[in-house]
Amino acid sequence: VTIVAARPRRRVAAWLPRLGAVVAAVLLWWVLTDLVAAPQSLLREFGPQHVPGAIAGLLDRGVLLPDIAVSMWRLLVGLLIAVTVGVPLGLLLGLHAATESAVAPVVQFLRMISPLSWAPIAVALFGIGHQPVIFLVAAASVWPIVLNTTAGVRSIDPGLLLVARSFGATRREQVSAVILPAIRGPVQTGFRVGLGIAWVVLVPAEMLGVRSGLGYQILNARDQLAYDQVMAVIVVIGLIGFALDLLARVVLDRP
């Protein structure tokens, strides 16, 4: 009974520092926007005390939930494209050292370019709408998946492949029975990193002339001088990003 009762106390004790950090951050936010800011400063409109009412207003207008849904759809499609391209490419580079050596300069060059730098090209190719946003999300998240998949393949014990070959396993069977299970961890890590980068890139990508999504809603609120709504959307973006990372950890860390 004592051991069982001690577990909830340990969990509470583990969460107390995190809760304290959140409270301290919100308090600092309030001090900067309410006490430090000048009486007529627009900075006061960004205070935490305005956020709940602004979120309620966005919900009453029926714009917040549809914008969240659109942003999530663009994120998921972009990530699906990144995984579809990144995992096979990572397998190819990991299995063929000569290919990896040949394309390494190109890969390093491309991955060092900010995904948002491709925005003018994306708009020129796809026009205004979902497509350029999805393209930028995919371009942002594909490289962590490629690099982690390649590293995962390179780290496989050669003895495992040798055993598979000794049993007469074909190349396809080696990939499905040995390589893919062995690189699960690195691929999951690449996906989590790619997810975080994709979410960061998504919001500015939605400011490229589209008329939906959380990025668009920030611009729309700014144009209406509704700075409390700007801050509210920023808070929503942060909360969703935190929830996505937590969900990815829970789902991907399952044995």
Model-derived features: positions:
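Short cytoplasmic-facing helical segments at TM-TM junctions of multi-pass membrane proteins
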Residues: 145-193, 218
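Generic hydrophobic transmembrane alpha-helix motif, especially the helices
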Residues: 108-144, 151-152
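Glycine-rich helix-loop "coupling/hinge" segments at transmembrane-helix boundaries
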Residues: 124-125, 153, 200-237
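Alpha-helical membrane-protein architecture signal
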Residues: 52, 61, 65, 69, ...
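Transmembrane alpha-helices
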Residues: 135, 139, 171-205, 231-232, ...
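Periplasmic/extracellular loop-to-transmembrane helix junction in inner-membrane transport proteins
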Residues: 7, 35-81
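Transmembrane alpha-helical segments of polytopic membrane transport and secretion proteins
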Residues: 1-23, 27, 246-255
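Transmembrane-helix boundary motif in ABC transporter permease subunits
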Residues: 77-107
